[in-house]
Amino acid sequence: MKAIVNVFLKAGVLDAQGKAVHHALTSLHFNNVSNVRVGKQIIFSLDEKDEKKAMTAVTKMCEELLANTVIEDYTIELIK
């Protein structure tokens, strides 16, 4: 099973990278861009057939290592 974890700063937390990317895009005359957020995507294989067990394991990974849950939110997608 393949897991895709997306991690982004929570709404209300200053996204300095997002601001920098937005500024760079507007300086390149891409003026129709707004609300730029920069995050990270972690993709890995998981040796687990049971989807519920896989989701539980990946959630635990996010809570303990992959995301700083004080300032970040995450989403998990499992692909068989």
Annotated model-derived regions:
Residues 1-11, 42-43:
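Short glycine-/aliphatic-rich beta-strand segments at the starts of folded cytosolic domains
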Residues 5, 11-12, 31, 50:
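Small, basic N-terminal interaction modules of short regulatory proteins
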Residues 8-10, 47, 79:
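Solvent-exposed residues in well-ordered beta-strands and their adjoining turns
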Residues 12-28:
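Short amphipathic alpha-helix segments
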Residues 37-41:
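Short Gly/Ser/Thr- and Asp/Glu-enriched loop/turn motifs at secondary-structure junctions
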Residues 52-80:
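C-terminal structural segments of small proteins and small subunits
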